[in-house]
Amino acid sequence: MFVLKLVLKNALRHKLRTILTILGMAIAITAFGFIRTVVTAWSAGVSATSDNRMIVRHSVSFILPLPFAYRDQLERVPGVSGVSYANWFQGQYKDPGDWKNFFPRIAVDPETYFALYPEFIVPPDQFEAFKRDRNACVVGAKLARDQGFTIGDVVTVEGDIYPGRWEFVVRAIYRGKDDKTDETQLFFHYNYLDERLRQEMPGRAGYVGWYILKVASPSEMPRIARTIDDSYLNSRAGTKTETEREFTQSFVSLSSAILESLTAASYVIIGVILIVLANTILMSARERTVEYAILKTIGFSRLHIAGLIIGEAFLIAILGCTIGLALTFPAAGALARQFPTFFPVVNVEVLTLLLAIGVALIAAGVAALFPTVRAFRTRIVDGLRAVG
């Protein structure tokens, strides 16, 4: 207890220096936690994928469509227990220059799509209303909050991929089964899109963007992928079949350079934390060389001296880490508010908190190592001679 009191008094002896060190630690920890949160948010879609879903897309590029006729053929592939399809629509909603107005707009088959994605929970009465109305849409709960959508609202979108003015009536609002589920999407009837294309652009009708497969056993996925891709190898629209995780990961990999840069920045921050803390502890230990010599003279052991140095380092590190972690949550919240659809799932993960705490504690231990060894090796007479 006496040593703890001395640790506290030593830390507060130079209040300004201690406060600035704690502040520097807090800023570094906040930056570390924020960057880690950005990286995990960027990859959130990968962790939310299912182990029993596969995606069939065009072998050349995701933007190229596949014939609607493939559906019946895919249903007959052994090991496939369910098939659905979807089509990227996009378009422009309100001001396209505002990130908040960018959210996925996808044409789907209501009956099969939501059966394959049970993580999208839609109230039964709303789902029935959605199925009855051909130009109806389902929006995510987060999207509804951000845009102020309510049941019965009309969402007007100016088409770009599919030109024209498109109106969708909000008939249902889905919520995710957990915090990893994307609640920022808008789904509408594929038939609404296809029927209008048949009237206005017949050459573009009868195609879908990609197929979603539900498989009976994940172990069968490699065989199913080979079977499907070999079947369409010489067709005009070849396929690339992959697991949902691989499909999602392919989009994340497009930003790999950014993610690697952010990860590297987080490592640099660890070095900053160490330098800031080590500088303070070294200065404090050097100033107290005489005091340590006197303490040794009156009977304090080397362990007591080590406790004073290490204790001060850990006290400053813990305070800085606590403040930094407390600031990480509002920083992550600001990111989610500023880019609600670009980062649909923003959570400060437990692993991020543990890493930040671990970094702070390791930095404290390393920062205290050299001054502790120096205090051990300094003889009493040499310490007393340091006066002046």
Residue ranges with predicted function:
Residues 13-40, 255-291, 314-323, 363-366:
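Hydrophobic alpha-helical transmembrane segments of multi-pass inner-membrane transport and secretion
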Residues 86-87, 98-109, 120-196:
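Hydrophobic secondary-structure segments that place a key small or acidic residue at a functional site
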Residues 339-370, 377, 382-388:
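Conserved transmembrane alpha-helices of multi-pass membrane proteins
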